[in-house]
């Protein structure tokens, strides 16, 4: 995740400003569990749960591909429109990877398999709350020789 908050409720966005470790401790915006700043040489700076099992919104660690796609989309969309990354939508308890606020548009990056039921549930929730949603698929989910169950829908 790219967004976390500190003890003073300040939101930190690692794509805009990488905080010093001394600015922490940091917490997940959704579950308020501790997260740590990771700023190594392989992955771009991001936050990760200290213990992931406590967060109902982040079920697994985000892959390199997921982080990079989300960051690239944010860089692109934020040039033209007010865009928020990892925006928590309290009305239906969903975290949008990217939310283009002035267009009521949610952009979701999906790099790992997702059941058709869960995809429909999340898409329906966005639409019921006035958002248009686009799902952008990582390479593992691209169409190969035949349709997967999810693609056949």
Give the residues covered by each predicted segment.
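Short, contiguous strand/loop micro-motifs
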Residues: 60-61, 107-110
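Short secondary-structure boundary/capping elements
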Residues: 41, 65, 90-93, 118
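N-terminal cysteine/histidine-rich coordination modules
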Residues: 1-76
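Active-site metal-binding core of divalent-cation-utilizing nuclease and nuclease-like domains
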Residues: 16-20, 37, 72-106, 114
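Catalytic cores of nucleic-acid endonucleases
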Residues: 96, 111-153
């Amino acid at each position: 995740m790219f967004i976390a908050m500190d003890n003073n409720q300040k939101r930190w966005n690692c794509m805009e400003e990488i905080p010093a470790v001394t600015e922490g401790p940091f917490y997940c915006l959704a579950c308020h569990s501790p997260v740590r700043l990771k700023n190594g040489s392989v992955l771009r700076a991001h936050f990760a749960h200290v213990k992931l099992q406590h967060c109902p919104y982040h079920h697994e660690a985000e892959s390199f591909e997921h982080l990079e796609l989300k960051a690239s989309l944010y860089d692109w969309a934020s040039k033209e429109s007010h865009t928020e990354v990892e925006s928590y939508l309290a009305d239906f308890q969903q975290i949008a990877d990217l939310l283009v606020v002035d267009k009521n548009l949610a952009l979701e990056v999906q790099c790992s398999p997702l059941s058709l039921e869960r995809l429909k549930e999340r898409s329906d929730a966005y639409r019921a709350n006035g958002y248009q949603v686009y799902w952008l698929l990582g390479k593992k989910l691209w169409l190969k020789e035949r349709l997967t169950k999810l693609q056949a829908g």
